[in-house]
């Protein structure tokens, strides 16, 4: 394409130029991105543009049509042979629609002045662009000096006569932004000062973030801000039939992209999510809670005829307990027990039966025993008295047998065995029971219930008692059995027809145990309970003096107890442990605190005080608190209290994705009754486990089951009733955060990385609020899903500090490097939320360095020493200064000076809302001199030449560049900074990191500098 130059017609097109120009225009008719809204596009205007050129012999419109006969508007000017050119092209009024800013895109061609013979003195290769704001769309009387200059436009490529011959089109595209704009519209003007130019198209547009539905929240069309670095926070509105879970927000960037989604909406009960909408549950389906994933089919024996049902109604004769979940089938009372048999033994009856044929669909079947005493003559029955005892119990029986004792002899009884379950009390129908009629036999007497001591000497004890409550005949005699305490195998029998005896020949000052039973014609009754009495010491002469030993012993015990209490108070333990009167006062002062079965507490700092409960816990109104499962006497109770039992048949294991100490980690799918199948992660317990390993394995589930937060890994349930034992959690597609970052080095924006850190901090705030200390927060223990949502995991193992030179925490799962652990936790085993904050700072460093190993190859001992001396990790490459400062705050030696997790979340939210604060990076030139001392580093002396060093790190391609720029020795190389690398032409980020990391290792021998706090 070209304009005729030289002595011909200065503004006329060269032969064939119009055709080429039209071809270029057609090729440039590309659709604008969805985030751009055109205010003017000269390529799409069908009629006259209405633009004005002056002087009239300046800009010239070339009117052509495309293959669809649509007009193509092109303006050209080529007054290159004449001096002092001032040719203006004015557009018509362009409505700005009240937008704060607009962008202008120009497509044009420009002739190379050197290719125009004779025009070098007057030819120009630029033109000027102006605008004038106006509320008047009819005003054209605008003076030149009223226009505001936007820019001088130069071509990236100009064309020559040779390009015309080769049919090469060099079309330039320039974009300029103008803002802020305050009036309804504006005019554009293009000034030619002597160039040979063709203006192919002019497009005026503004950018917006298009309306979108994300996480069931609708975000409207949002015009971008006038500042190119500004992020606009936009609140979303929940779609129809949804409710807010966490206030939905997103940020609109200057490029028209939605970034950093926060919060979400959930379909309300009776609706499920489909294609970013909440669809009604159709009849026969229900959804009880917004947190349920989808509509579920009504469980067995229930139905719903309406749409949007939140629960299902039970069929006739079927019921649901108030505590039954809505996903559970409706059930009915059980049928009667079957095949009851009895076995009479004097005045005891043993009953046994078979469970009912129909349990009603429930597992909570129990039995109730009704006892009736019947008159053999009248046939009338009455309830048995309270003297009848039931072994093990009368109500709530779980097994299918019971024994009734202490019945009357020669009496007719009717026993009714009724089966009941959780919905029996809702059944208005008749009771379901089976009856058994029995007659008791002649019976032996009941046991003696009360024994009184009489005269006691050093060698004898006198006793008396009352006749049994139920003699069941004439008492023929009593049998008294006694023995020295703890000598039960050597006993003496005395028989007496009276209710009193004296046992002689006993040892002075010794304890003896007595038992008594009665005999009738039916035989001996049972022995009484044990009664313990003690003979007098040798010094005691009479029963009057028999109380002296008791007094002496009591005084002695009292003195000992007093000494213990005084010593305890003086040691300060009483105050720390809440014992004695201090504990009593505390109980009075705080009546809202309820203790069960007592507690013990280790001596520690006030902020670290924790109560360890035995088979119970403390409850505070309105506060959800983490409960340590190790405080349960039965670990299985903790598992079943906090974790849901899942049938193994509901789980499909697909493949192994990892392995641990206890077994394999697999991915699979979970299909629960009435719910859709969804992916899960499954931890299995290996074959041949010990009971201790099983407790440790399920301990993690007991902990995880207490948490419910979008940034904490969610426990679906456990499998404990079949093998293998399994823990089932949600599936995180991208795995551990450290591995994911290494695989995607440099692929994310700073805002995305901050979003990840914000999620981790939010999860840790939740744990901290519950009183849970993680102890092993590291990127390897953070899982990330396909939406880049990070979730805290690994709650399973207790940690013990070993006395080894590596000073590493040891768990049942292996050693945890101390490089994530706060110094007070290393030195004093003080684990608190503040020590978790230290670990969070290390996680921040891992994220911003894309998974680099903290402290590189330093040994644990070197890390401990360096941290104790006040040195800290240097800033990762290209790390915003605000984030690195937050890391340093997390690494304060005084744990009380570290920020709390709620403060960290607030700081990160502010950075996300103001992304311009993330543009200030840590001074790159200071990074190398901020290194930590490494243990046994590879120093500069390990390589004989720069080339050998670069080859060793597989960067040999840069050898010649280093040598040409004066880096000929290893000493000079050791001083290279990141800016030096960029100046040398090392532009690939991965190569920069590899070279800088190697320099960091060498620096220890040349620069003994760190980052002191």
Swiss-Prot record:
Expressed in which tissues: Detected in the 10-day embryonic brain, weaker expression in the rest of the 10-day embryo. Undetected in adult tissues.
Residue stretches making up the Protein kinase domain: 651-912
Fibronectin type-III domain sequence ranges: 333-443, 444-538
Disulphide-bonded residues: none
EC number: 2.7.10.1
Active site positions, chain numbering: 776 (proton acceptor)
Membrane topology, Cytoplasmic segments: 571-1013
One GO location term (cellular component): plasma membrane
Pfam families associated with the record: EphA2_TM, Ephrin_lbd, fn3, PK_Tyr_Ser-Thr, SAM_1
Compartments where located: Cell membrane; Cell projection, Axon; Cell projection, Dendrite
Phosphotyrosine modifications at: 626, 632, 809, 958
Positions occupied by motif PDZ-binding: 1011-1013
GO biological process: axon guidance; ephrin receptor signaling pathway; hippocampus development; regulation of actin cytoskeleton organization; regulation of GTPase activity
Annotated transmembrane regions: 550-570
Amino-acid positions noted as binding ATP in the UniProt annotation, renumbered to this chain: 657-665, 683
PROSITE patterns hit by this protein: EGF_2 (PS01186), EPH_LBD (PS51550), FN3 (PS50853), PROTEIN_KINASE_ATP (PS00107), PROTEIN_KINASE_DOM (PS50011), PROTEIN_KINASE_TYR (PS00109), RECEPTOR_TYR_KIN_V_1 (PS00790), RECEPTOR_TYR_KIN_V_2 (PS00791)
Molecular function via GO: ATP binding; GPI-linked ephrin receptor activity; transmembrane-ephrin receptor activity
CDD domains with a match to the protein in the record: FN3, PTKc_EphR_A, SAM_EPH-A5
Protein name: Ephrin type-A receptor 5
Functional summary from the UniProt entry: Receptor tyrosine kinase which binds promiscuously GPI-anchored ephrin-A family ligands residing on adjacent cells, leading to contact-dependent bidirectional signaling into neighboring cells. The signaling pathway downstream of the receptor is referred to as forward signaling while the signaling pathway downstream of the ephrin ligand is referred to as reverse signaling. Among GPI-anchored ephrin-A ligands, EFNA5 most probably constitutes the cognate/functional ligand for EPHA5.
Residue intervals annotated with topology Extracellular: 32-549
UniProt PTM: Phosphorylated. Phosphorylation is stimulated by the ligand EFNA5.
Domain SAM, chain residue ranges per copy: 941-1013
């Amino acid at each position: 394409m070209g304009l005729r130059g030289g002595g011909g017609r200065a503004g006329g097109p060269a032969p064939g130029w119009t055709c080429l120009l039209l071809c270029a225009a057609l090729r440039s008719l590309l659709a604008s991105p969805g985030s751009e809204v055109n205010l003017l596009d000269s390529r799409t205007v069908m009629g006259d543009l209405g633009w004005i050129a002056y002087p009239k012999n300046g800009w010239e419109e070339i009117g052509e049509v495309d293959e669809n006969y649509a007009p193509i508007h092109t303006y050209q000017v080529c007054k290159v042979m004449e001096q002092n050119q001032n040719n203006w092209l004015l557009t018509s009024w362009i409505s700005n629609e009240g937008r704060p800013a607009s962008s202008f895109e120009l497509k044009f061609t420009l002739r190379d002045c050197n290719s125009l013979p004779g025009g070098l003195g007057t030819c120009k290769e630029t033109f000027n662009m102006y605008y004038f704001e106006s509320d008047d769309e009819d005003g054209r009387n605008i003076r030149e000096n009223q226009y505001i200059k936007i820019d001088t436009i130069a071509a990236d490529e100009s064309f020559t006569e040779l390009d015309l011959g080769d049919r090469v089109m060099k079309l330039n595209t320039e974009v300029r932004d103008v803002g802020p704009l305050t009036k309804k519209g504006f005019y554009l003007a293009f000034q030619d000062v002597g160039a040979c130019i063709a203006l192919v198209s002019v497009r005026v547009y503004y950018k917006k973030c298009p309306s979108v539905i994300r996480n069931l929240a609708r975000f409207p069309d949002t015009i971008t801000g006038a500042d190119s670095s500004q992020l606009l926070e936009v609140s979303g509105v929940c779609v129809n039939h949804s409710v807010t879970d966490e206030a939905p927000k997103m940020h609109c960037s200057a490029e028209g992209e939605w970034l950093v989604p926060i919060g979400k909406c959930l379909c309300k009960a009776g609706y499920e999510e489909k294609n970013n909408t909440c669809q009604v549950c159709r009849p026969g389906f229900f959804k009880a809670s917004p947190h349920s994933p989808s509509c579920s089919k009504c469980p067995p024996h229930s139905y719903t005829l309406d749409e949007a049902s939140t629960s299902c109604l039970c069929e006739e004769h079927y019921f649901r307990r108030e505590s039954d979940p809505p996903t559970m089938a409706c059930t009915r009372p059980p049928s009667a027990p079957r095949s009851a048999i009895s076995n009479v033994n004097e005045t005891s009856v043993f009953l046994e039966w078979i469970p009912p044929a129909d349990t009603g669909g429930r597992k909570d079947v129990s039995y109730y025993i009704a006892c009736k005493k019947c008159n053999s003559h009248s046939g009338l029955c009455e309830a048995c008295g309270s003297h009848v005892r039931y072994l093990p119990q009368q109500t709530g029986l779980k097994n299918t047998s019971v024994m009734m004792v202490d019945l009357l002899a020669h009496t007719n009884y009717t026993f009714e065995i009724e089966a009941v379950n959780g919905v029996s009390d809702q059944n208005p129908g008749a009771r379901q029971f089976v009856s058994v009629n029995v007659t008791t036999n002649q019976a032996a007497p009941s046991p003696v219930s009360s024994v009184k001591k009489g005269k006691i000497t050093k060698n004898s004890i006198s006793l008396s008692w009352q006749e049994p409550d139920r003699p069941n005949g004439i008492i023929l005699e009593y049998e008294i059995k006694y023995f020295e305490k703890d000598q039960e195998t050597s006993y003496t029998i005395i028989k007496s027809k009276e209710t009193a005896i004296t046992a002689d020949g006993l040892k002075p000052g010794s304890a003896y145990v007595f038992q008594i039973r009665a005999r009738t014609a039916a035989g001996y009754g049972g022995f009484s309970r044990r009664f313990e009495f003690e003979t007098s010491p040798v010094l005691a002469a009479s029963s009057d003096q028999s109380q002296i030993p008791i007094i002496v012993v009591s005084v002695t015990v009292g003195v000992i107890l007093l000494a213990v209490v005084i010593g305890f108070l003086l040691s300060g333990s009483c105050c720390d442990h809440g014992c004695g009167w201090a504990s009593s006062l505390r109980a009075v002062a705080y009546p809202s605190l309820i203790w069960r079965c007592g507690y013990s507490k280790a001596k520690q700092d006030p902020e670290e005080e924790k109560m360890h409960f035995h088979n119970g816990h403390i409850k505070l109104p309105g506060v959800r608190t983490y409960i340590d499962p190790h405080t349960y006497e039965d670990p299985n109770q903790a598992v079943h209290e906090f974790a849901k039992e899942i049938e193994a048949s509901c789980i499909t294991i697909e493949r192994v994705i990892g392995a641990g100490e206890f077994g394999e980690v697999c991915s699979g799918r979970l299909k629960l009754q009435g719910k859709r199948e969804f992916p899960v992660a499954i931890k299995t317990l290996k074959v041949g486990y010990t009971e201790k390993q099983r407790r440790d394995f399920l301990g993690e589930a007991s902990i995880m089951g207490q948490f419910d937060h979008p940034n904490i890994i969610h426990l679906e349930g456990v499998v404990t009733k079949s093998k293998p034992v399994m823990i089932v959690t949600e599936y995180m597609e991208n795995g551990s955060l450290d591995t994911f970052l290494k695989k995607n080095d440099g692929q994310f924006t700073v805002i995305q990385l901050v979003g990840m850190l914000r999620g981790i901090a939010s999860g840790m705030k939740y744990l901290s609020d519950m009183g849970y200390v993680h102890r092993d927060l590291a990127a390897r223990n953070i899982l990330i899903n396909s939406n880049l949502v990070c979730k805290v995991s690994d709650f399973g193992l207790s940690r013990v500090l070993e006395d080894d030179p590596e000073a590493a925490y040891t768990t049942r799962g292996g050693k945890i490097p101390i490089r994530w652990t706060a110094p007070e936790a290393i030195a004093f085993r003080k684990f608190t939320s503040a020590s978790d904050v230290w670990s969070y700072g290390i996680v921040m460093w891992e994220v911003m360095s894309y998974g680099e190993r903290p402290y590189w190859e330093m040994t644990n001992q070197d890390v401990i020493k360096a941290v104790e001396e006040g040195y800290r990790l240097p800033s990762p490459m290209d790390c915003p200064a605000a984030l690195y400062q937050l890391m340093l705050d997390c690494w304060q030696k005084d744990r009380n000076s570290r920020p709390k997790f709620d403060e960290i979340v607030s700081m990160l939210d502010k950075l996300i809302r103001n992304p311009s604060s993330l543009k200030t990076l840590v001074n790159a030139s200071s990074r190398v001199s901020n290194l930590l001392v490494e243990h046994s580093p590879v120093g500069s002396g390990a390589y004989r030449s720069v080339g050998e060093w670069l080859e060793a790190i597989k960067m040999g391609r840069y050898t010649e560049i280093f040598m040409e720029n004066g880096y000929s020795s290893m000493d000079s190389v050791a001083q290279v900074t990141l800016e030096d690398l960029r100046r040398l032409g090392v532009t690939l980020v991965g190569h920069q990191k590899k070279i800088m990391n190697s320099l960091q290792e060498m620096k220890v021998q040349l620069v003994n500098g760190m980052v002191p706090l």
